[in-house]
């Protein structure tokens, strides 16, 4: 009966949506100073996921649009982005004049919030990572590519595994959202990365601070929202192919992509492969078993019509990383089983398969819209220790995600959104070894948000209620069964004061919530690659936090600057602490503890343009994480990133040439300060000295008859081959070198990279 009611409801909504009248929008885009037409300008409707590119005469046409009020975004590299509200009931023609700008703080639409909103009107800090930034870097994985953004760090284990950290918090405090659903892949583990093909990601939004309002539990630190490429314009079919090479670990990467739009029938398919042998540094030489292999297949097929869109997204991601053990010979060299140039991981290694199917829908209902997303994920994570034939550890996780929200018509200037969302999970242990108990989980949340423009002011607020039920299964002599229920009320209120066209002040107060994960509650075992034996606590309480954000930004033709400050007080903050003198099978024992925590810090960025086309970009980020009232050795929260200063000098050689376009050269100083604020109790962690890395890069697009047909990028990271250890590298705690008494394995040395992208 319930199923029939649901089917009737969906059919009625579909009929209502189909009744929408369609319209067409066209226009011309020119340069404000010269009046010349601008080709290659991206015109995009974020709510509708539709767009187009301007032709050689600067003209564009987008058809099959619903007659609604929505937002349009117009952007071109080297020019100020325009974001404007538009009523498609009355507007049929709309021209734009783009102003050339050196400023990096341009206006964009943020879709990771409740509905769409401009970055200018977001009271909480948001970082936008553009396609140009992603393509212009040499990275081992997606999170590695994001880790140079202010306030973002990564926990690494070897060459191919990275976990995001936002403002000093990671693991289950940072959500990764892709294809509209939260990524679920056993993210409680140190050596469990993010199972996403980096080539399938076109742009990224990084929401800093508690985002529990939209996403529920686990968004205490923030959210990383991954976006694929927009649906191609009507009648367009495109093919892209890319290849890259990196010298340090011999990385070879290939990707092929095809996409198209025929009368609203859209598709986008991609295949990717990446292999790397052991990386090297000047202290350790080749680091045995730091190699990895990666493959990915993803596809989208669906309809984009006047009533909205309905897309089915399918993906498979496979990763086989070697696990660095860091054992050493008497002469201090790392124990190796081959010459380090093989692309096949040796024992121990992981084998990760992540399957995902997402049905993503957006229906236009009168002046409002309904967004409905349902997803299924299967994560199979196997670890081979003694034999390549049978895994010792074998995790199988099933997840069903759901998210529905309704964006009501604007009423007296108020924009309201109401929604529900949550997930169901079932996890099982299929191997002989176990670390966590098998479990079932279900959570659900409901929320409402509102915002309004009041002249120079923009205000927003929201509230959410969450409930999570978790039941673990007993295993004789290892795990006792337990049932837990976690309830949380979260919310936020914020305001922005526009100080004219170029500057803004913002203030936001938010309440965060996070239920303990299964590892914190029930773990009991040693995981290869973590160098420790972890013991959970089934009596842990959920984390609650209050965070205050304050910010200021300014942007002009020659200067852009942004300052974001925060202070966060978290109750029942969960962390790992080493039990002094306690070991299990020679592995040190770490137990999950909790208590009051205070985190504060921020990010400051300044981009100065002393002459035309010259960018001098500086970004400084820091966080201080303490446990109030605790003695010095246990005063600081463990594994907090060190302060960091990124300084980049970039010159745009050619911006709009007939053959070469967007041509640049860049030099960067990456200064990671010493981290002496450590959790020293029980030897949990050690201090890390500071280091400076020098990076160079260059890139250009190639044009043929006004269209970009290829892009080339060259990079040189750690040019001086500096020997260093990141404070958040798990390999920092590998075995001690008997020759010099230094513990752990060092990070990669000099790395030269080349990347070529072809477009048809």
Feature map (PLM): residue ranges:
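Short, acidic, small-residue-rich periplasmic hinge/interaction motif at the N-terminus
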Residues: 28-34, 41-46, 73-80, 89-135, ...
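Short Pro-Gly-centered beta-turn/loop motif in secreted/extracellular proteins
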Residues: 35-39, 61-69
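Short, acidic Ser/Thr/Gly-rich low-complexity loop/linker segments typical of extracellular
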Residues: 48-59
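Exposed aromatic-hydrophobic patches
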Residues: 59-64, 95-97, 699
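Hydrophobic loop/turn residues within beta-sheet-rich immunoglobulin-like superfamily modules
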Residues: 65-66, 86, 99-101, 169, ...
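Outer-membrane beta-barrel proteins, especially TonB-dependent receptors
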Residues: 112-129, 133-137, 144, 156-169, ...
């Amino acid at each position: 009966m319930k199923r029939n009611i649901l089917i009737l409801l969906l059919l009625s909504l579909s009929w209502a949506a189909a009744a929408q009248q369609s319209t067409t929008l066209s226009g011309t885009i020119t340069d404000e100073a010269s009046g010349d037409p601008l080709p290659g300008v991206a015109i995009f409707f974020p709510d509708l996921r539709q767009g187009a590119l301007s032709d050689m005469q600067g003209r564009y046409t987008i058809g099959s649009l619903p007659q609604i009020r929505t937002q349009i975004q117009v952007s071109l590299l080297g020019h100020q982005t325009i974001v404007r509200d538009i009523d498609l009931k009355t507007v049929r023609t709309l021209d734009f004049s783009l102003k050339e700008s050196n400023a990096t703080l341009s206006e964009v639409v943020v879709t990771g919030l409740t509905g769409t909103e401009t970055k200018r009107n977001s009271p909480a800090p948001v970082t936008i990572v553009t396609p140009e930034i992603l393509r212009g870097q040499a990275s081992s994985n997606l999170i590695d590519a994001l880790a140079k953004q202010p306030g973002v760090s990564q926990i690494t284990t070897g060459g191919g595994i990275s976990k995001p950290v936002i403002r000093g918090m990671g693991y289950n405090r940072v959500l990764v959202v892709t294809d509209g659903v939260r990524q679920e892949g056993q993210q409680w583990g140190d050596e469990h990365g993010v199972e996403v093909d980096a080539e399938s990601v076109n742009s990224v939004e990084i929401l800093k601070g508690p985002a529990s309002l939209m996403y529920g539990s686990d968004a205490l630190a923030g959210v990383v929202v991954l976006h694929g490429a927009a649906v191609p314009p009507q009648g367009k079919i495109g093919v892209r192919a890319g290849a890259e090479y990196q010298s340090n670990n011999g990385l070879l990467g290939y990707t092929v992509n095809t996409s198209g739009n025929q009368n609203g029938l859209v598709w986008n398919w991609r295949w990717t492969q990446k292999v790397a042998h052991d990386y090297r540094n000047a202290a350790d030489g080749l680091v045995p078993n730091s190699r990895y292999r990666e493959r990915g297949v993803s596809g989208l097929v669906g309809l984009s019509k006047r009533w909205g869109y309905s897309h089915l997204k399918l993906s498979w991601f496979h990763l086989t990383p070697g696990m660095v053990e860091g054992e050493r010979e008497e002469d201090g060299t790392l124990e190796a089983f081959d010459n380090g140039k093989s692309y096949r991981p040796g024992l121990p290694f992981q084998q990760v398969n992540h399957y995902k199917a997402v049905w993503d829908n957006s229906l236009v209902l009168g002046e409002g819209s309904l967004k409905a997303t349902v997803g299924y994920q299967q994560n199979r994570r196997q670890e081979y220790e003694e034999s390549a034939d049978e895994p010792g550890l074998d995790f199988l996780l099933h997840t069903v995600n759901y998210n529905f929200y309704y964006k009501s018509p604007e009423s007296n200037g108020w924009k309201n959104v109401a929604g529900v969302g949550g997930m169901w999970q079932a996890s099982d242990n299929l191997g002989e070894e176990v670390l966590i108990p098998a479990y079932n989980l279900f959570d659900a949340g409901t929320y409402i948000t509102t915002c309004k423009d009041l002249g120079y002011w923009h205000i927003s607020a929201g509230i959410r209620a969450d409930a999570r039920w978790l039941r673990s299964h007993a295993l004789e002599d290892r795990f006792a069964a337990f049932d837990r229920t976690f309830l949380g009320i979260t919310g936020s209120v914020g305001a922005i004061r526009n100080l004219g066209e170029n500057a803004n002040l913002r203030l936001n107060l938010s309440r965060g919530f996070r239920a303990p994960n299964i590892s914190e509650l029930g773990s009991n075992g040693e995981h290869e690659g973590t160098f420790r034996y972890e013991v959970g606590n089934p009596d842990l309480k959920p984390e609650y936090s209050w965070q205050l954000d304050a910010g200021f930004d300014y942007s002009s033709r020659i200067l852009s600057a942004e300052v974001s400050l925060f202070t966060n007080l978290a109750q029942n903050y969960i962390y790992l602490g080493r039990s002094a003198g306690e070991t299990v099978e020679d592995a040190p024992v770490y137990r999950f503890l909790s208590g009051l925590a205070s985190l504060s810090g921020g990010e400051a960025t300044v981009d100065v343009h002393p002459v035309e086309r010259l960018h001098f970009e500086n970004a400084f980020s820091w966080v201080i994480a303490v446990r109030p009232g605790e003695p010095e050795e246990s005063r600081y929260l463990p594994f907090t990133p060190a302060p960091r200063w990124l300084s980049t000098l970039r010159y745009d050689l050619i911006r709009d040439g007939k053959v070469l376009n967007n041509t640049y050269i860049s030099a960067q100083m990456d200064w990671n300060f010493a981290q002496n604020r450590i959790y020293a109790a029980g030897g949990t962690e050690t201090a890390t000295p500071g280091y400076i890395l020098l990076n160079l890069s260059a890139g250009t697009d190639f044009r043929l008859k006004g269209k970009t047909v290829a892009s080339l990028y060259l990079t040189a990271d750690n040019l001086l081959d500096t020997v260093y250890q990141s404070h958040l590298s798990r390999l920092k705690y590998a075995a001690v070198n008997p020759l010099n008494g230094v513990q752990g394995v060092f990070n990669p040395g000099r790395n030269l990279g080349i990347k070529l992208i072809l477009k048809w």
